[in-house]
Amino acid sequence: AYKMEDVEKITKEAPFVSSGRKIKGKAKATCIGYRGFVDDGYTFGVGKWKNTGRLEMTMSHGYQVVPWFYVGLGVGIHYWTDEDMDFGNIPLFADFRADFLESSVTPFLDLKIGYAFGLNDNGKGFYCNPSVGVRFAVSSSYGINVGLGYEVQMCKIYYSSYFGDYYGWKVENLGGISLKVGMDF
């Protein structure tokens, strides 16, 4: 037991959840430790490839190094929806993310960079998706993310047009504007 004159200040500490993260409130920023993401989205083709949109699903698992910086590894599946391009790929990537505020609503920057493996001969090549967005904390452990970015997807494409002057394989950027919605945990 302490004597009252020895006590300078009485404070209440935040309780710990099972993962070792402190709960700072009902819906606050992320804490240091394991963190995972699952995103669904669509990329709208641009330029020469404006009709080559694709459905996407990605997930990333890693470590929140400090409250504002995350690093992880991820995998996804992309499927092109154009009638002339029936193929998909599986990107494997490193994921780097910065959350700017320690609050329940925070802007973020995200960079996914890696290589996509084609589900057939088309669709394999360098993959990069920088994006900006907003995270809405739902609880101390979960958040909803909305992001907008530009996706670079280098692909080896086979040209077989009878009316064109080129036949064979060519590497093209099937890049586009990506819109993603997902959750983190």
List PLM regions with ranges:
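A short local loop/turn or secondary-structure capping micro-motif enriched for an aromatic residue
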Residues: 9-10, 80-81, 153-154
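Predominantly the C-terminal beta-signal and adjacent terminal strand-loop region
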Residues: 106, 125-185
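Intrinsically disordered, low-complexity segments enriched in small/polar residues
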Residues: 18, 23, 31-34, 39, ...
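Compositionally biased alpha-helical segments
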Residues: 1-37, 41-47, 51
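Short edge beta-strand segments in beta-sheet-rich domains
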Residues: 2, 91, 172-176
